Structure formats: C-alpha cells, structure tokens
Amino acid sequence: MEGREMKITDLKFEKIKIKLKKPFVISRGATEYCESVLVKITTDEGYYGFGEATPSRSVTGESIDSVTFVLKTFKEILIGQDPLAIERIHYILNKAIAGNTAAKAAVDIALYDIKGKVMQEPLYKLLGGFENKVQTDITIGIGAPQEMANEAKEMVARGFNILKIKTGIDLKNDVEAIRLIRKSVGDNVRLKIDANQGWNVHDTLTAIKMMENYNVEAVEQPLADWDFDGSALLRKKADMKIILDESIHNAHDAIHAMKKDSADMINIKLMKSGGLYEAEKIDAIAESAGINCMVGCMVETKVALTAGASLVAAKRNITDADLDSFMYYEEFEGIKGGFEVKGDTIILSDKPGLGIEINM
C-alpha cells in the first residue's frame, strides 16, 4: 500500500517595499528600496513554508509585477502537488514557464522550509550541515571616493572584516576609492571589487595594475555576462582572482565556465538560480572542478537571506558570502527569526526549516 502524499492547498503572496537608509549605487544603476514578494505555501497537513522573490530587471529580467503574474500561474499548477517532491515541482514549473527565476526561487524556498519542518531540522542541516554560521562581507556602493572610505571605516568599526567595493563607472574614481579605503581600514581587512559588467578586458587589466599596491584579492564580474573567453583571458594575464556572478545562473552556465576556465570562484544567487535546488547543482559542479563558490544576494529580506546563509553554512565548498542587505534598511518588523548577527557573522536558528514566522 502506497503512503498518502501531502498536498499543497494554497499559495498566497504579498508585495513589500522597504526604503533603504540611502540609495545603493552600482555600475548598472541605483536602488532606493528593498522590493520583494513574500510567498506562503500551505498544505493539507498543517505545514506551511515561506519564500521570497526579489526580482532584478537587469539580472533576472523580472519585475515585481511579472513575479506576481507568474505566481498566480504557479498557484494553479501547484495546488494538489506534493510539496516534498521538489524535483518534480521544478520540472513542472520549468515546463510551464521558462526563466522567471526569482518567482521560482520564492516557491523553491517555501518548499524547502516545509521540508525542514516535516523533518524537524533547520534548513542548514537539511542541505548538508557543515556548520551553522556564516561570515559575510559588507558591500560599499559607488560614491565619492572619500565618502566610500568613510563608510568602509565605519563598517570595519562595526565588526566587518571583508569589504566588497562596487566599481565600474569611472576607473579613475574606482582606483582612488580603493586607495582611500585601504588607507582608512588598514592592512588586515580583506578587499574585493565588483564591477558588475562595467569594464572590458583592457579596463580590467588596467584597473588591476593600478590597484596592485592595495592588496585587492578578487574582482567580481568585470566583463559582460556572455564574455567567458574574456574572463578566461583575464585569469591568464591578471594576478587577481576572477569571480563570475551574472554569467552564472544555472548548472549549464557553471559547466560552460569550467570548460572555458573562466572562473576562480562562482557567486551563486538564489534569485538567479531559481532557488536552492539548482544552487546545489552549481556548487557540486564547481566543487568537482576544484572551484570554490560564494553566495550573494539581491536587496533581500531575512527570508531569502536565511535561505542563502543556510546554503553557505551547509556546504564546505562555499567559502564566502555576500549576504549583507539586512544592513541597508531598518529591520522589517513583519519577519521574525531566521538568524541573528554578531559582528560580521550570521548565526542561523536551530528551529525547523527557515525558522522564520511572518503574519500573512
């Protein structure tokens, strides 16, 4: 006799918009709000899970409106499905609608939250359980060089030991910012830069040469997302690690990067990958090729951040994290639990699933 399958009975969602403390500027534009769609999936056995979609027009090709439209379609598809059959659900959703990875991530995260509650285990243990805490960097957005240096110094005083500096608009400004930041924070703080596709090969090599005295350990996505050959060339010519972010959305992209020798590290984001299910595949491919991963974020709430931090904590091969968007806005009172922060360390809850509660 076959066991009875649990069934999804409802999917509801709500849009949220949280004003940032100040605009967050990168080479591709500025952001003034954390805009997300929170999702709740409920089942006929009383279990429920929360998820989040934080779309990006320039990265995932989605907007808040497109996410809500797609989630309405997903609701029709998901009613009656077994929430623990995560691979089957991804297959069904991918057949129904291509892309739309932030919307899929919201569903995926909620399903893993349910699975953790059913198994009575926190998500980080469900995914691998390597440890329960994560050291994150803090990102400094583009601005006047001295202002960036002042912000960097403030973040180090708050306990952050790894800084990721946004670059890619003006090379002279970028180099001056790095010079002033290194001067203000001293030699013991790790520095990375992120151009968000703002440079070409020549610009990148020039920037690396000009920054050689400031102990910058890595440059993230300096080139266009399609330029795997250019990234491979940089790895040969530059004395700095090359991290791929926008180039890597899924496992197929990861395989392509490995074949091209394009990356020293891959930045996984749940909104690009469609959630944890595909993110685990990306990490497994990278690990098999001897390449470490990191997990980054959009400007997300605690829901997606907890999912991302759980993945980092779970996997030995994921050595770095850029899960800092909780620093950009005042704490959103509607989301409780998930993790606490001490200095630059995210300490995950031991409650089942995400360990989060939302009144929705």
Model-based region annotation:
Residues 53-61, 139-143, 297:
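Glycine-rich phosphate/pyrophosphate-binding beta-alpha loops
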Residues 125-238:
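Metal-dependent enolase-superfamily TIM-barrel catalytic cores that perform enediolate-based chemistry
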Residues 281, 340-360:
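Structural signal for terminal/edge beta-strands and the immediately following C-terminal loop/tail
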